[in-house]
Every structure is written in structure tokens, then in C-alpha cells.
Amino acid sequence: VLGRRLGGELLRLRDAAAKTQQQAAEVISATNSKIVKMERGWVPMRDPDIRALCEFYGLVDGKAVTQLLELARLDRERRKAKGWWQDSPHPGALTEYIAMEDAASRVRTWQLSLVPGLFQTPEYARALAVSEGVGPWEDPAEIERVVDIRMRRQDRLTGERPLKVYAVVWEAALRQLIGGSVTMRGQLERLLEIAGLENVRLQVLPFHAGGHPCVTGPFTILSFNEDEAVDVVQADTIASSVWVENEVTSSAYGDLFDRTARRSLAQRDSVQLIEAIRQEI
């Protein structure tokens, strides 16, 4: 997050100065690719590079330059501190998502066919990990690591800095028997417990709501406490996960989420539906 803030500020300064990535790269004897990575916050940044770019972009405010250098220092320190998620067997994109989730203050998630990962029981998560076409893991030890990582993510729900979670789930996700009836009953019981947390809002979009705006697939919106931090959207496609970090598009996803939530049952009614489905299974 710190790297993204710093990179975003450098991008803003370059745009304001009407400079190209090629020109910026020449100033610090780098490639265009490095400038792209810097502006997206993907790499740690050296103080000499930041000073040179600020001078090139015409930033003469010494205090502003000092603030950027401090952001760079904090970002470098954070990168050195190994996060608990870095031992994850997940693919790189998912590991990156877990790191972002750990830094977030609020999560809004829409799920079509699965219970959100933050709400899953170990049994449900394990069943997903071994399901053909869902989990790529075959080694039992690796499967348990996947489950452990998912459970560790849930510490944010009740930890020192509780994560605010607003989840909207299609009714299909509650009726799909992942792992069998016993596992699914346990999962629905877990949802009923989680719905009682003050920092969790859970709504179900019922079948009888008919067509809805979010037919294209699941997505999650991550929000951060940092000033002027743009929401980050992670959306799943057939082949990969797509990241959205620009204000216009992330705002569009936020509007899409809100419209779907308005068509969903209120939390109290959602809890009643979950209980009814649990009794049916």
C-alpha cells in the first residue's frame, strides 16, 4: 500500500509535468519497464531516484520531497518484514491478494457460487482445495497449508484491528453441497455465527430476485485507511485474476456492488434464509 501511494504520487507529478516514461527512465538511467513498476508500487525505490525524478518533474517543495522519501523508507522496511502469508502455496496473484487483504481496513465482496474465503470453515476450504477444477493441490500436506492460510486470514475478523466485511452472496452458493451435506451444514452454521459480528454485514441475493447486475462473476473491493488511497478491485476471470487500481473503474465496481446489495435481502432476512437452507440439507 505504501509503495502504491508513492508510485501514484510520482505518476501524478510526471503527468503534471507532461513528461513521458521514456524521459523519466533516462533521468535515472533505467528502462521504461522500471518506471512502470515504480509508478505501480511494485518495486522498492532508491532515494537518489526519487530526488532525481522530483527535480525533473519540477517539485521544488522540500517538505513534499521529504515526505516522499519517508514513504519510500517505510515501504522498504515493510518489504523486508516477511508477512505470514509469504509461506503460502498459493499462486503469486493470490498471495498478493492475501497481503493486500491484510493491509485493508474494509472488504466488500460479491460471490456467485462459493462462500467468501473469510467465512469458510476448515472442512469447506479443504473440500474446495481437493475439488477438480477448483483447487490445484494434490499433496495432503500442501492442502493443509492452504487450509491453514485461509483460517489465518480470518483472524482479522476478531483481531486487534477488526476488518470490516460487507459480503453479498448469491443463494446458489448456500445450496451447493461443497464437501457433502455434513460439511455444508457446518458451513451454514458458521455463516450464522459470523453474521452476529459487529464488523460483518452479510446479505443474500435470493433466486426470486431474478436477474441482477453482477452476472459477470465474483469480485472483491479492498479499501484502505491511508489518505487519498484508491480502492483496489480484484475480479476473477476464467483464466486469471484481474486487478483494478484506478479511481473511475473501482468506483464503477462500487456502484455495481451497491446496486446488487439493494436487490438482496436485509441481513435479518438473509440470516433466516440461511437457517432455512441449513434445516433443509
Regions found by a protein language model. Give the residues of each.
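C-terminal regulatory/effector modules of DNA-binding transcriptional regulators
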Residues: 161, 168, 174-281
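Short alpha-helical DNA-recognition segment
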Residues: 17-36
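Short, amphipathic alpha-helical "recognition" segments used to contact nucleic acids or chromatin
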Residues: 10-14
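Alpha-helix N-cap/helix-initiation motif
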Residues: 3, 16-17, 180
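Interdomain hinge/linker segments and adjacent boundary elements that couple functional modules
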Residues: 2-8, 22-26, 40, 44-175, ...
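A ubiquitous short alpha-helical element
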Residues: 34-39, 238, 242
